[in-house]
Amino acid sequence: MLKAKGYKTGIFGKWHLGHHPEFLPNNHGFDEFKGIPYSNDMWPVDYDGRQVPSDHRLAKAYPQLPFFQNFEVVKEIKTLEDQGQLTTELTEAAVDFIERNKENPFFLYVPHPMPHTPIAVSDKFKGKSEQGLYGDVIMEIDWSVGQIMKKLKEHQLHENTLFIFTSDNGPWLNFGNHAGSALPLREGKGTAWEGGQREPCVIYYPNGIEGGRIIETPIMAIDLLPTIAEITDAELPKNKIDGKSVLKILTGEDHQSPQEAY
């Protein structure tokens, strides 16, 4: 969609749509891909970091976690220490992508594997949050956001860049201190309660959206694609799109959700 408008496109993080070549990002609109093809818990390792025996269900279901650069597996993620390098490595790739494309319109997608379990953090953030391992992981993601924004500001791109920070679901409460919390909302991932479905969403776009506001009108993640299409004047794909543009809600021109059900 955006490539047709001359955008350079990159994804650095979790693709989550499979590892076979026909399903990889480079065959679905992205110029560059660096990251893992599915969730970081899809590997033959238990949550405590131990390799499972060959007859374990995880060993039967998954190989070592592959790390891709475009179509090539460049390494395998085998340990929690390996996982702990992902946030920084993907952030550095994202910042480099901005640097190389600062003269072009670009679309950058950074779906970090963390804080999905199993969680891990780089050495530079271990123990820094004083909120345990989960706090350290969130602190490193916060650093990642800052690095990306810093690079945008370095090249005076931040005011004309649509910056979206959000999540896909609530905390996986089964994992206790490794899961986070949705309080004061009820429950978490895998439930229909608000703690599982209602997520933070921060949108920053100085040239198009007035800042400093809290928008109460509900929107959905599937609304982001048509919203981006409207902002960039791009043509939506011909296949059915369930999302609706919420640009008028973001600009304050409308306060009515375009969706009938959530």
Residues covered by each model-derived region:
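Formylglycine-dependent sulfatase
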Residues: 1-262
